[in-house]
């Protein structure tokens, strides 16, 4: 599914923002976390110097791998490596990303910015989209933002990609689905982009799908504590992975969908990378263990044959080895679940009534908790649509309204 996810999630956002739209890397090492994870929803302790260095650009280049035939004529792009913070430990992290600017002259106040959070691609260093000519499927979505007059600040997330000057071994692990780190990486990408391209405005909207939807939402929640110096106007989350703890019950009962089964090794390895109490052998069996390298890889030749594995999946391949192992996994995923904090930033959540990756009831329960906290959320359920959905003109109009200063409305 991860291979399909790349195309799917690019397609979601490519379709969603257009008003006229119609319907070989080795596996991440296990148990490499420094200690058992004790995840807190609060801000981590961050050293004064590291706090001041957020968004600092280590390097940037206008010599990029991107396919400019997919972008509006006259657009510009830079890759960048910048500093951010781990949401788990508060330690500094080095992250790769990119900034794209539309053709022409910026409007007064600078180009409005889309902080773009990509969807699930994987958990290994070969999964950094900004090393790929088509951003692993996101290039069309970026092009649409540029055509609408927005600059795009794009993050790979810590642990995905190989930042210049750092070895693969020194690169941080990607804490898949951990919301604070991803939120910090996105906010710091906007900071870094404004350094690389001074013509960018401080005003921005967060946008993402699936894992990126969770990231956009988390950026809104932690913006008050972390986002100083920029002006986040709203966060648009498509099919967001707000709370994936329900995967555990499905794994126990051997009822994971095919899409969820593709996702499952990334969930396990992403947790194991930061928590030594997660033993991957407790969760990955059969095809999921034997072909894990293929399932985790993002690029050929390592990823070749990923789609064909679906016919070999057995429900028991993902079943936790004990009730204790199941409870441990459930606890970790519950600790990651959004909402984590109330937010004053307006939120848009669009999700599919037939989603086979993130069932709509999971999304609705999470949004209910956020509504109870007093968040302003516009909740849109698209009946008959799945993890790849088409919200038509709604998304683009909602984003335009945020930049125009139109008061946001919710339907909690």
What are these regions (language model features)?
Residues 23-106:
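Catalytic-loop region of hydrolases
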Residues 343, 348-355:
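Short beta-strand/loop motif that positions the catalytic acidic residue
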Residues 87-96, 100-148:
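Short, surface-exposed "cap/lid" segments of acyl-processing enzymes
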Residues 191-259:
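Primarily recognizes the serine-hydrolase "nucleophile elbow" in alpha/beta-hydrolase
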Residues 17-20:
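C-terminal motif of bacterial Sec signal peptides marking the signal peptidase cleavage site
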Residues 330-331, 357, 361-412:
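C-terminal catalytic histidine-bearing segment of alpha/beta-hydrolase fold enzymes
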Residues 35, 41-49, 238-339:
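Accessory cap/linker subdomain of secreted extracellular hydrolases
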Residues 175-196:
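Alpha/beta-hydrolase active-site loop
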């Amino acid at each position: 599914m991860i291979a399909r996810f790349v195309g799917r999630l690019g397609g979601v956002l490519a379709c969603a923002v257009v008003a006229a739209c119609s319907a070989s890397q080795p596996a991440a090492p296990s148990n490499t976390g420094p200690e058992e994870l004790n995840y807190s929803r609060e801000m981590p302790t961050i050293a004064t110097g590291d706090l001041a260095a957020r968004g600092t650009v280590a390097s940037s280049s206008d010599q990029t791998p991107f396919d400019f035939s997919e972008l509006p004529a006259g657009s510009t792009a830079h890759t960048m490596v910048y500093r951010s913070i781990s949401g788990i430990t508060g330690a500094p992290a080095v992250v790769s990303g990119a900034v794209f600017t539309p053709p022409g002259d910026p409007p007064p106040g600078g180009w409005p910015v889309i902080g773009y959070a990509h969807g699930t691609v994987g958990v290994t260093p070969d999964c950094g989209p900004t090393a790929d000519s088509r951003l692993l499927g996101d290039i069309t979505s970026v092009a649409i933002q540029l055509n609408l007059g927005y600059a795009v600040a794009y993050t790979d997330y810590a642990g995905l990609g190989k930042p210049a000057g750092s070895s693969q071994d020194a690169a941080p692990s990607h804490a898949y689905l951990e919301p604070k780190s991803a939120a910090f990486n996105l906010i710091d990408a906007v900071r870094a982009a404004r350094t690389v391209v001074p013509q960018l405005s401080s005003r921005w909207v967060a946008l993402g799908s699936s894992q990126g939807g969770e990231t956009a939402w988390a950026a809104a929640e932690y913006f008050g504590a972390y986002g100083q110096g920029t002006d986040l106007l709203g966060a648009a989350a498509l099919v967001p992975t707000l709370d994936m703890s329900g995967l555990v019950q499905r794994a126990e009962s051997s009822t994971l969908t095919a899409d969820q089964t593709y996702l499952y090794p990334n969930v396990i390895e992403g947790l194991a990378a930061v928590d030594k109490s997660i033993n991957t052998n407790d969760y990955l069996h059969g095809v999921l263990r034997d072909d894990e390298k293929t399932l985790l890889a993002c690029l050929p030749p390592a990823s070749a044959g990923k789609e064909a594995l679906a016919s070999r999946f057995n429900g028991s391949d993902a079943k936790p080895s004990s009730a204790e192992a199941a409870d441990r996994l459930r606890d970790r995923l519950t600790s990651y679940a959004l909402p984590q904090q109330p937010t004053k930033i307006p939120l848009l959540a669009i999700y599919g009534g037939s989603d086979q990756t993130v069932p709509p009831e999971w999304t609705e329960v999470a949004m209910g908790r956020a509504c109870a906290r007093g968040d302003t959320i516009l909740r849109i359920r698209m009946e008959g649509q799945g993890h790849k959905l088409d919200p038509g003109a709604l998304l683009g109009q909602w984003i335009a309204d945020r930049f125009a200063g139109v008061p946001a409305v919710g339907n909690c």
